[in-house]
């Protein structure tokens, strides 16, 4: 039996639109402050202009346990440059003004230091749609569940191939907007082959809920984006975009346009 997602979702209309167009959404991640704050904000608006449906605004953190080497290096550079949590909120505001949809992706500690309710308030005021919390599980998220409800934000939790049926069901039930399915075990990073565990993980989520599922951790090409877009509602790209940004904004735009074309290849019926 599947559970229908009844709570209003800020990202719901986007996924409805993508479904009507028979395609997946492109979800792109960049860390705030890399290579500097102003360039990172410009890069995020480039994502919007190049066909990215949702921008994940990363909050650099000093102990990024789930990030691969590309994102870790970018995070270290951003922290060395003095990036702050408020800079991420500025990025969200710029994305919103550019006509895009922004969610913040952060480990929980920076939000805890900022104040959960205050962060939710300021994120909503900046035009943000929600928050991805890779190291926060619903069982320990009472503060965030209350704050996201109070300010109407989506809350995106992670599931993995190792998630037990009970943990997966509980995580999906607590999520709103979409569920982040980690398609490979371990840290993030672009890979030549996308994990074959991803379709099975998406199917497990679909068996218990109609909430959209975004698949991440490994996408780097149009072909991989099209492959995942055949069974997932969202294709999440991080490390490949960070690498492209390291080569400059034109490289970032080119890759984003390529990935956007991939998710727009017609999905199988």
From Swiss-Prot:
One of its GO terms (cellular component) is cytosol. GO terms for molecular function: tryptophan synthase activity. It catalyses: (1S,2R)-1-C-(indol-3-yl)glycerol 3-phosphate + L-serine = D-glyceraldehyde 3-phosphate + L-tryptophan + H2O. Pfam families: Trp_syntA (PF00290). The active site is at residues 56, 67. Keywords: Amino-acid biosynthesis, Aromatic amino acid biosynthesis, Lyase, Tryptophan biosynthesis. Its EC number is 4.2.1.20. CDD domains: Tryptophan_synthase_alpha. Gene3D superfamilies: Aldolase class I. HAMAP family: Trp_synth_alpha (MF_00131). This is Tryptophan synthase alpha chain.
